[in-house]
């Protein structure tokens, strides 16, 4: 699911350097894939990540902390065992909108990889 906020191409000039992309992920015990996911999407043009970790018992929290030293990641520790996905994802989307303002927000799962034909999420989104 992609949530869009309007991009004013008159203001941005329509260039991909002006497009901001944030990705949200709700994760739990994703140590086997989370680093690959974040590195891949960062290389594809995602500027900011907001990642909510819900009670991971594996190395996911340590991986996120290590990656946040080199990639813009806002880590949210969700310790509530009442799984409230709708509320949590909405909260992450709101935080992403505050971070990037007039840009794009992609809600993603740790095992999903967005592979645009153009080779760049920014090029793909600029063409829309």
What are these regions (language model features)?
Residues 117-128:
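Conserved donor-nucleotide/metal-binding helix-loop-beta segment in metal-dependent transferases, i.e.
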